[in-house]
Amino acid sequence: MIGAADLVAGLTGLGVTTVAGVPCSYLTPLINRVISDPATRYLTVTQEGEAAAVAAGAWLGGGLGCAITQNSGLGNMTNPLTSLLHPARIPAVVITTWRGRPGEKDEPQHHLMGRITGDLLDLCDMEWSLIPDTTDELHTAFAACRASLAHRELPYGFLLPQGVVADEPLNETAPRSATGQVVRYARPGRSAARPTRIAALERLLAELPRDAAVVSTTGKSSRELYTLDDRDQHFYMVGAMGSAATVGLGVALHTPRPVVVVDGDGSVLMRLGSLATVGAHAPGNLVHLVLDNGVHDSTGGQRTLSSAVDLPAVAAACGYRAVHACTSLDDLSDALATALATDGPTLVHLAIRPGSLDGLGRPKVTPAEVARRFRAFVTTPPAGTATPVHAGGVTAR
């Protein structure tokens, strides 16, 4: 049996700066140790896909992320692992438990996943190994992980059987509890016509500080942003719908720069729990811009459910420090100026009309190229500062 301290020391030795996940009884010693370890940040998330997205953001911000999960949660992780971390070639550590291990007694809901866990990691193109029960073998396992992360620049998996890690006491502080206030703009003389997404993005670029990092959601938002002005400060998500906010969270926790997430209503609704995650961990430098057109533009304009949801009120209830509900481009300018000058997280909601540019193209740079130039931008000290931006973990090539 190994100690949780040995496991955490191995992770920090790899350069892991953030661990995010959903608890499993097999993971209890590891989680309890990480919570009390000053060298590593632990983020509770609402579901396992968020953990993978936070890990991606951690690397993009200059660190190295570790996503932890019960193997039953690998299904939730599969989308960001295969459509974000793999095409963008983002290194990360994934620790999954082995419930339902063949030959061991367990609950019926774990039997199938227990049989296919290793195969699922293989299908996700992840090299992986068992977490052993001796410290000597653990050092060997971490050496293999380090080599894989550096050579393949892809996530590496550890499979944790039952009873490998000794018990560890929990020493957790009380969580932050807060709700924000919604500022609703309804000013006489301002146009009632909803702006287009391209006009909103043009206004964003006009207001955006040059030192700000931007994470844009998959689909037309990223394609239009790229068309308007392709910048090193932009990270265009090409997959992992619903994960922009938690990728942005991972970035924001690793840099003093302002981080702006450009999101859509369909994307936010797909992982609505991410609002609670952002609100709970409360990065002061995060601005979450939601462009709400009420439809899935990228797939033909089918309606989302945003007309039935007050997204600004939900964000306020989830702990965003400030929320702005905008109806015009001038509202957007005012809200962005306020958000960028005050502590967040701040959500800025703008109702826009459906539709996009005719003949809209796609980025000519690969996801891996976008990820590396973005990481280089984020980890370069902003002009006029002497404090280096944090960079840890696996060095980007």
UniProtKB/Swiss-Prot annotation:
One biological process term in Gene Ontology: antibiotic biosynthetic process
Family: Belongs to the TPP enzyme family.
SUPFAM superfamilies: Thiamin diphosphate-binding fold (THDP-binding)
InterPro entries found in the cross-reference section: Phosphono-pyrv_decarboxylase, THDP-binding, Thiamin_PyroP_enz_TPP-bd_dom, TPP_dependent_decarboxylase, TPP_enzyme_TPP-bd
E.C. number(s) listed in UniProt: 4.1.1.82
GO molecular function: magnesium ion binding; phosphonopyruvate decarboxylase activity; thiamine pyrophosphate binding
Catalyses which reaction(s): 3-phosphonopyruvate + H(+) = phosphonoacetaldehyde + CO2
Presence of keyword Flavoprotein: no
NCBIfam families registered for this protein in UniProt: Ppyr-DeCO2ase (TIGR03297)
Lineage: Bacteria, Bacillati, Actinomycetota, Actinomycetes, Kitasatosporales
Keywords, ordered alphabetically: Antibiotic biosynthesis, Decarboxylase, Lyase, Magnesium, Thiamine pyrophosphate
Record flagged with keyword DNA-binding: no
Known pathway: Secondary metabolite biosynthesis; bialaphos biosynthesis
PANTHER family referenced in this protein's UniProt entry, alphabetically: SULFOPYRUVATE DECARBOXYLASE, SULFOPYRUVATE DECARBOXYLASE SUBUNIT ALPHA
Stored Pfam families: TPP_enzyme_C, TPP_enzyme_N
Essential cofactor(s): thiamine diphosphate; Mg(2+)
Knocked-out gene: effects: Disruption of the gene abolishes production of phosphinothricin tripeptide.
Role summary: Involved in the biosynthesis of phosphinothricin tripeptide (PTT), also known as bialaphos (BA), a natural-product antibiotic and potent herbicide. Catalyzes the decarboxylation of phosphonopyruvate (PnPy) to generate phosphonoacetaldehyde (PnAA).
Protein name, per record: Phosphonopyruvate decarboxylase
